[in-house]
């Protein structure tokens, strides 16, 4: 159904995009049509402008022609004028009247010439202006035409691309539509199949409910009749019931205890190193015991620190005893974990040790602050360590409180309710994380303190190495506590789910005495079951079982096809059986008819040999009459009925076929068929019994395979959990090593800086000593 919803959503999105593209296509089509109309109007305007341009060109040609004529006329007039002037010079003396006349003509000609020149200039100006206007208009129209042609080409390209895009999208949508239709049809078929399956499952559920109800009634009747003593309501008696043995749970719990033991060993080693190097530091700084006597406070502090192994080592021993008490055969719960009390006592003794050394440690830090060598920054670091040590002791007190609460069910079960022990585990995890954070702060502050102490003028190499050792021990302690905190948080659900036994819903723990009795009863039950245990029969080999499983899977896959083929073949066999019965009856009847015909022939041949010819002639007339009647009687069918059925036959005059013999033959035939069918039925019954036994065996194998599959899945889950846990441990160790390397690199850098400073100081001292020696020599 989710797939159909996704497909419908995709189809709706495609339809929306298609509608958007269609609307855009219509808008673009309108734009293209408008641009085409504009281009057509501009083409018409261009034609009109071309026509006007041609007219102007014609006018200009006519004007140029007229101008040329006028220029020629002016030249002629000038020539005539020059001729007249020459003639006038020659004939000045001849006639003054003619000179006056020529002067008048000359003035007229000059006026006419001046007018023509002015008109020619005006026409030239008009021609130039018209030419410039025509060129400008032509350039504008050409640019507009180019722009319109480019726009039209762009619009045409856009239209082509959109049409291609629309065709592609339409094809895609059609393909998607066909695919969606096919998928919808398949989903409808699947929905029908699912409905049928749900109906079958509901029917099976009803059958199972009815069967379970009947079984419940039977079991209740058996319990009421056969179980006279029922102690399920008494908590005292329930405490003595042996719980179910979960070997996998015991192995996992032992594995977790082993991991916790390794973490505790790491923490114990780090604590021993920390207290030992702290003792060494108290004897070195601020006063070195090798050169001077240290204060009584530090003497007492170092004396107490010297006893740290007496309090720290038992923690490892107590955890080892707890680990050894968790075996595969026992039932490990809080009521039976007696060794947890010993570990709690060892933790209490170590807590007393911490409380004993805490005042001396705080006073020692205060004494360092009061020293003249202590700077302000070093005092600040000492006060931070002062606060951190108080916090560390307080968090250890909280941890001891919760561990002692966990040890109560094995000693005093009334001190803790079953509903509260999960909260105790969560508080232990929180306390471990809090101690990890405090140790991080201690390592940071102590590293800063160590770098500041290296700058003290009286700092020795022994102090530097001691500080490095203390830092490494604090880092290892931080890593160990971080590992056990993450380990506890990762397995908190396992700890809180199944670390108690007893009746469900109970608020109190089982008493230790009852738990001890339960363990004794469990040992007795195990011994009794071992005495009853018989050697198992040889099972199917693993390879053969795998082969049988493959065959079973292949047979289940092809079962439906084979069932259809069997149904079709059964229908064909039934039809063929019917046809066979029909033709066998036809053959029997034909055989009977053949025998009767042969008998008739023999009787007719023996009867007619003794008759004479005269009798034939005499009886000829009567025979003709009888033949007519016999033909009629022969043609009339005779119906015979029996137990088998009805038979219609035509009889002769000579002899009627024996119906009883026919019935006997048919009866014999059916008896033979019945015997054959009974033999086939017996064979089919034996085969069905054999197949039923095989199916039961295969069902048993299938159930065993499912159980093995479940066990393998559980093992796979455990393996994945162990892999994740190992990866977490690897990451934590990697981070711790990286932190250590970074701290060591920082320490080396600081050491190099101090060495360079010391070398520079030595060089300066040497230079000053050389200068002083030279001054002394000069003196």
From Swiss-Prot:
GO CC terms of this entry: early endosome
Keywords associated with the record: Coiled coil, Endosome, RNA-binding
Biased composition (Low complexity): 96-105
Biased segments, Basic and acidic residues type: 624-637
Keyword Coiled coil: yes
Alphabetized GO MF terms: RNA binding
InterPro entries: PPP1R21, PPP1R21_C, PPP1R21_N, PPP1R21_six_helix
Annotated spans, Disordered: 85-105, 612-637, 760-779
Pfam families per the UniProt record, alphabetical: KLRAQ, PPP1R21_C, PPP1R21_helical
Coiled coil: 2-212, 556-614, 693-739
Localization, UniProt: Early endosome
Top-level taxonomic group: Eukaryota
Coarse class of the protein's main subcellular location: other
Function: Component of the FERRY complex (Five-subunit Endosomal Rab5 and RNA/ribosome intermediary). The FERRY complex directly interacts with mRNAs and RAB5A, and functions as a RAB5A effector involved in the localization and the distribution of specific mRNAs most likely by mediating their endosomal transport. The complex recruits mRNAs and ribosomes to early endosomes through direct mRNA-interaction. Putative regulator of protein phosphatase 1 (PP1) activity. May play a role in the endosomal sorting process or in endosome maturation pathway.
Domain-related comment: Coiled-coil domains of PPP1R21 are essential for RNA binding.
Subunit structure: Component of the FERRY complex.
Identification of the protein by name: Protein phosphatase 1 regulatory subunit 21
Protein source organism: Gallus gallus
């Amino acid at each position: 159904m989710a797939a159909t919803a996704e497909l419908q959503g995709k189809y709706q999105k495609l339809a929306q995009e298609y509608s958007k593209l269609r609307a855009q296509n219509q808008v673009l089509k309108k734009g293209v049509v408008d641009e085409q109309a504009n281009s057509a109007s501009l083409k018409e305007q261009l034609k009109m402008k071309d026509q006007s341009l041609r007219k102007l060109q014609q006018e200009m040609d006519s004007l140029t022609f007229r101008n040329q004529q006028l220029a020629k006329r002016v030249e002629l007039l000038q020539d005539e004028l020059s001729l007249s002037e020459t003639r006038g010079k020659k004939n000045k003396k001849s006639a003054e009247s003619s000179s006056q006349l020529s002067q008048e003509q000359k003035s007229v000609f000059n006026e006419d010439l001046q007018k023509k020149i002015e008109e020619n200039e005006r026409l030239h100006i008009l021609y130039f202006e018209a030419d410039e206007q025509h060129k400008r208009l032509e350039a504008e129209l050409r640019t507009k035409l180019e722009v319109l042609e480019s726009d039209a080409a762009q619009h045409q390209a856009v239209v082509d691309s959109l049409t291609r895009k629309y065709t592609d999208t339409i094809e895609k949508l059609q393909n998607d539509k066909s695919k969606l239709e096919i998928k919808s049809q398949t989903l409808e078929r699947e929905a029908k199949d699912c409905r049928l399956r749900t109906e079958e499952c509901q029917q099976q559920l009803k059958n199972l409910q009815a069967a379970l109800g009947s079984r419940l009634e039977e079991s209740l009747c058996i319990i009421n009749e056969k179980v006279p003593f029922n102690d399920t309501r008494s908590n005292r008696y329930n405490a003595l019931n042996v719980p179910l043995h979960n070997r996998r749970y015991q192995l996992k719990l032992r594995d977790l205890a082993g991991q916790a033991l390794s973490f505790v060993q790491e923490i114990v080693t780090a604590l021993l190193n920390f207290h030992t190097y702290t003792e060494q530091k108290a004897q070195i700084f601020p006063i070195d015991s090798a050169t001077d006597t240290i204060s009584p406070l530090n003497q007492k502090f170092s004396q107490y620190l010297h006893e740290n192994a007496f309090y720290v080592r038992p923690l490892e021993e107590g955890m080892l005893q707890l680990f050894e008490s968790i075996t595969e055969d026992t039932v490990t719960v809080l009521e039976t974990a007696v060794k947890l009390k010993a570990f709690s006592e060892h933790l209490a003794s170590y807590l007393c040790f911490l409380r004993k050394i805490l005042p001396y440690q705080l006073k020692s830090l205060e004494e360092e602050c009061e020293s003249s060598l202590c700077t302000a920054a070093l005092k600040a670091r000492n006060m931070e360590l002062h606060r951190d040590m108080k916090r560390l002791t307080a968090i250890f007190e909280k941890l001891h409180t919760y561990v002692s609460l966990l040890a109560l069910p094995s000693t005093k079960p009334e001190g803790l309710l079953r509903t509260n022990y999960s909260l105790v585990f969560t508080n232990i995890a929180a306390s471990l994380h809090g101690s990890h954070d405090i140790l991080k702060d201690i390592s940071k502050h102590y590293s800063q303190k160590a770098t500041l102490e290296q700058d003290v003028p009286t700092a020795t190499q022994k102090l530097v190495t001691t500080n490095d050792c203390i830092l490494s021990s604090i880092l290892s302690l931080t890593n160990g506590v971080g590992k056990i905190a993450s380990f506890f948080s990762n397995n908190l659900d396992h700890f809180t789910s199944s670390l108690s036994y007893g009746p469900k819903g109970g608020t109190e723990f089982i008493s230790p005495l009852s738990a001890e009795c339960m363990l004794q009863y469990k040992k007795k039950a195990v011994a009794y079951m071992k005495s009853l245990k018989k050697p198992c029969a040889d099972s199917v080999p693993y390879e053969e079982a795998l082969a049988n499983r493959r065959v079973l899977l292949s047979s289940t896959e092809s079962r439906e096809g084979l069932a259809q083929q069997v149904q079709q073949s059964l229908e064909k066999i039934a039809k063929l059986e019917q046809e066979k019965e029909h033709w066998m009856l036809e053959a029997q009847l034909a055989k009977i008819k053949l025998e009767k015909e042969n008998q008739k022939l023999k009787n007719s041949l023996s009867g007619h040999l003794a008759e004479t010819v005269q009798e034939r002639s005499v009886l000829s007339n009567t025979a003709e009459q009888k033949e007519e009647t016999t033909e009629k009687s022969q043609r009339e069918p005779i119906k015979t009925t029996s137990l088998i059925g009805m038979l219609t036959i035509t009889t002769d005059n000579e002899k009627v076929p024996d119906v009883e013999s026919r019935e006997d033959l048919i009866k014999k035939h059916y008896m033979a068929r019945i015997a054959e069918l009974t033999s086939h039925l017996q064979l089919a019954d034996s085969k069905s019994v054999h197949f039923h036994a095989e199916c039961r065996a295969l069902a048993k194998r299938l159930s065993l395979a499912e159980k093995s599959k479940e066990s393998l899945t559980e093992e796979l889950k455990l393996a994945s959990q162990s892999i994740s846990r190992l990866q977490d441990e690897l990451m934590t160790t990697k981070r711790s090593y990286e932190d250590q390397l970074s701290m060591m690199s920082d320490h080396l850098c600081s050491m190099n800086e101090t060495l360079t400073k010391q070398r520079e100081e030595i060089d300066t001292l040497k230079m000053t000593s050389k200068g002083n020696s030279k001054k002394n020599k000069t003196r």
